[in-house]
């Protein structure tokens, strides 16, 4: 049968039209899909895995077997491996050369998943599982990789921190949607900010350990952030206290670290001192441990509207900070969508690709609102200009997942990103048993209202024409009927 390369638009139109292209169930949208004319078969009831001996203990293998019924004989065979493994060596040339990329082949006889690395293999497994989620599989091959290297969430909002259980649930969600970073930086954790020198008490430390372990099981790097700028002294004593705190976190299983200098004044804002401290941490802690991820820092001047060009804060960081250290950036203002011109502007000053801290769907500046809006407004041609992209969510962890679903899709495959279709898919996945009620409720809970940042979202689009007719003073009977029906639906959705 003739193979055809499915465009992403076709794949998503299959989903929205109710057709059974199973790959359309996958989020993020894959980069390339070759389908055998839409040939479908029943998803297997049992599977068995084939791999190199040591691969069976990998996160990918465990995820596969934990989500499927495993049987040694007569089951659907899923062959898994990473480039270089003997079991999948003949497929190595088909695997994209991008970090975290993977190749997936699905046929009636079995499936093959080969990752460029461990994360790539894990993401291939997630694609297979998502494809099976409605009881069918499609004969196809998937060649896939992420656009942005680091993708995920920074818990950096003011207000009530997420509960321990909410964070665990978030990591499961990130893993399914191929996000690889979570940065722990709740402003109300005293051991992160106000008492940053003080070690975590045993009970709180064990909770951090559990978070780090659970994140790892979902392919997520758990970044623990420290915020010393409020009262740091820039002396050896404070420098050693900071490194000692990081060592404590390392012993708890944390393997990724960030240092924040945001929202501070006075002595802690000096760029040369920040660079000196961070280079010391990088040289004497991060680089000494081969299993630790690159250091991330949040600068004091973290958006364009706050930059003082005469003082040269950003240029000092750019020239003095080790090039392996990532620098966060919120855009042209504190709450702003990310555009190409703005990323070019900051990248030239910091002498590296910006690590975006996007303040959406956070609502700590309008705490009487929630936003269930889709993720949109960021340019679609900036993937090669970013080192990372993390979203700052609401204090409402579950409600944040609609936007985070979009962040995962956007950062994985920007050029194919369609925020309207993505939003519909998010609603369907997050509340499949009552998706229509969630959709109705979300339609009228998107906008943030008037706020000091001037950041607004479209809301109630489906009512605009009806409202205009009513406001004309002479609404038709049909308008009144439709408006009454929609208001009744809204009332039911709120129950």
Regions found by a protein language model. Give the residues of each.
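Positively charged n-region of N-terminal signal peptides that target proteins for export
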Residues: 1-4
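Bacterial N-terminal signal peptides
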Residues: 7-16
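Acidic, contiguous N-terminal accessory segments
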Residues: 11, 20-108, 134-142
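C-terminal functional modules
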Residues: 416-495
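Structural motif
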Residues: 49-56, 80-85, 114-116, 156-158, ...
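Conserved beta-strand positions in the central sheet of alpha/beta enzyme cores
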Residues: 183, 258-260, 390
């Amino acid at each position: 049968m003739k193979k055809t390369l499915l465009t992403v638009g076709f794949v998503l139109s299959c989903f929205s039209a109710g057709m059974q292209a199973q790959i359309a169930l996958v989020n993020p949208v894959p980069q390339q899909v070759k389908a055998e004319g839409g040939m479908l078969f029943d998803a297997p009831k049992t599977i068995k895995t084939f791999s190199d001996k040591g691969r069976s203990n990998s996160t990918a293998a465990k995820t596969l077997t934990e989500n499927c019924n495993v049987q040694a004989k007569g089951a659907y065979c899923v062959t898994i491996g990473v480039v270089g493994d003997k079991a999948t060596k003949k497929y190595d040339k088909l695997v994209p050369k991008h970090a975290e990329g993977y190749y997936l082949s699905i046929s009636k006889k079995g499936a093959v998943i080969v990752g460029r690395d461990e994360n790539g293999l894990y993401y291939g497994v997630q694609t297979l599982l998502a494809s099976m989620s409605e009881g069918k599989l499609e004969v196809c091959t998937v060649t896939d990789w992420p656009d942005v290297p680091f993708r995920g969430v920074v818990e950096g909002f003011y207000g009530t921190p997420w509960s321990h259980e909410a964070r665990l649930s978030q990591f499961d969600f990130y893993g399914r949607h191929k996000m690889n970073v979570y940065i722990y930086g709740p402003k109300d954790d005293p051991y992160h900010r106000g008492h940053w020198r003080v070690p975590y008490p045993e009970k709180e430390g064990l909770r951090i350990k559990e978070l780090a372990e659970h994140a790892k099981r979902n392919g997520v790097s758990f970044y623990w952030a420290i915020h010393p700028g409020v009262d740091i002294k820039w002396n050896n004593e404070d420098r050693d206290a900071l490194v000692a705190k990081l060592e404590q976190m390392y012993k708890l299983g944390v393997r990724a670290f960030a240092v924040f200098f945001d929202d501070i004044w006075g002595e802690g804002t000096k760029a040369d001192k920040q660079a000196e401290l961070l280079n010391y941490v990088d040289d004497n802690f991060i680089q000494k441990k081969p299993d630790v991820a690159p250091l991330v820092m949040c600068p004091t001047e973290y958006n364009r509207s706050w930059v003082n060009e005469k003082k040269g804060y950003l240029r000092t960081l750019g020239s003095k900070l080790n090039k392996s250290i990532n620098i966060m950036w919120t855009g042209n203002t504190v709450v702003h969508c990310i555009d190409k011109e703005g990323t070019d502007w900051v990248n030239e000053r910091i002498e590296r690709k910006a690590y975006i801290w996007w303040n959406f769907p956070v609502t700590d500046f309008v705490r009487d609102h929630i936003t269930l809006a889709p993720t949109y407004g960021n340019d679609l041609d900036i993937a090669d200009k970013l080192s990372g992209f993390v979203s700052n969510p609401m204090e409402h962890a579950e409600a944040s997942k609609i936007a985070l679903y979009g962040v995962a899709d956007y950062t994985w495959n920007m050029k194919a990103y369609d925020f309207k279709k993505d939003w519909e898919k998010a609603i369907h996945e997050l509340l499949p048993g009552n998706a229509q009620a969630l959709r109705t409720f979300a339609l009228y809970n998107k906008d943030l209202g008037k706020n000091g940042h001037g950041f607004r979202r479209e809301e109630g689009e489906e009512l605009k024409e009806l409202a205009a007719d009513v406001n004309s003073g002479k609404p038709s009977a049909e308008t009144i009927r439709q408006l009454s029906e929609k208001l009744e639906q809204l009332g039911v959705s709120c129950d």
